[in-house]
UniProtKB/Swiss-Prot annotation:
Molecular-function GO terms, alphabetical: acyl-CoA (9+3)-desaturase activity; oxidoreductase activity
Induction statement: Expression is enhanced about 10-fold by exposure of the cells to light. Low basic levels of the gene transcripts increase rapidly upon exposure to low temperature and decrease again to low levels in cells shifted back to high temperature. The induction of expression is completely blocked in the presence of rifampicin, chloramphenicol and 3-(3,4-dichlorophenyl)-1,1-dimethylurea (DCMU).
Protein name in UniProt: sn-1 oleoyl-lipid 12-desaturase
Domain of life: Bacteria
Phenotypic consequence of gene deletion: The disruption mutant loses the ability to desaturate fatty acids at the carbon 12 position. The growth rate of the desA-desD double mutant, which lacks polyunsaturated molecular species of membrane lipids, is dramatically lower at 20 and 25 degrees Celsius than that of the wild-type strain.
Membrane topology recorded in Swiss-Prot or TrEMBL: Multi-pass membrane protein
Residue ranges of the motif Histidine box-1: 90-94
Short motif Histidine box-2, span: 126-130
Amino acid sequence: MTATIPPLTPTVTPSNPDRPIADLKLQDIIKTLPKECFEKKASKAWASVLITLGAIAVGYLGIIYLPWYCLPITWIWTGTALTGAFVVGHDCGHRSFAKKRWVNDLVGHIAFAPLIYPFHSWRLLHDHHHLHTNKIEVDNAWDPWSVEAFQASPAIVRLFYRAIRGPFWWTGSIFHWSLMHFKLSNFAQRDRNKVKLSIAVVFLFAAIAFPALIITTGVWGFVKFWLMPWLVYHFWMSTFTIVHHTIPEIRFRPAADWSAAEAQLNGTVHCDYPRWVEVLCHDINVHIPHHLSVAIPSYNLRLAHGSLKENWGPFLYERTFNWQLMQQISGQCHLYDPEHGYRTFGSLKKV
């Protein structure tokens, strides 16, 4: 049962009618969520681990025993299941998986290791994203470039940006992973020992697992058992994250004009995917409540989203994953003008 609180009570008078929630505090929205949304349940948390382990096992059994022409299907399944492992680690990074920090850190490192994702590196960068969602030149996740920044960049950089913002959006997380998570200068001095530990963990995993895989199954085995599922994982990682924050209606604001309540409620997208994807990926697509409070475990996101629809429905962006959506995102959402919103690369030729 939710406590219904009108989005704009008589005591809240918006200073800008075009931005009716910009004057609200984030806590005003969070207070409307049922308390049950924030309850951690070990049984549900570990059930998500078992679902992921079972799905990964099924995928690898398929890769091993099904005919070669079934490989694309088994790669898609296994890569999607590995995305579920990332989501388990994602909850650990937000401390919403377990009550004890050491459990979160241990499970997070184990979940991220096969993906070669350094846990603390990701956790710290992701925390920054949550603190500065849709804040121009501060957010670090799919923050669109300005026209000036794009035109001032070297040609090779512009080429890569065009690719990632266009037809190769599905590689975006690979670039983000490789360029951001292993560079110590991206982290405060106080956090660098933790970052070094996480980097050491994934290097150790790679140093043991990759040679063992190649020795026992050959280079093709490395491609078949690790590389292809890993690429499918990055397809989902890139797709989920770009859809979370990239449709033409989403607004990015400079720091002086930024509102946490507006950014987290009205600057994030809920997207429905095929149900099997949502199950294997533990509802990572139910993203709006997660941005309002990272304390909500993944298994409570749907409850929270239902409450948001009841209380804040007009301010929510909801979409369905399909080819038309991805064409819209990759075809229109290229560069950003704070006054007019997204611009396409093609619009530069008309100026």
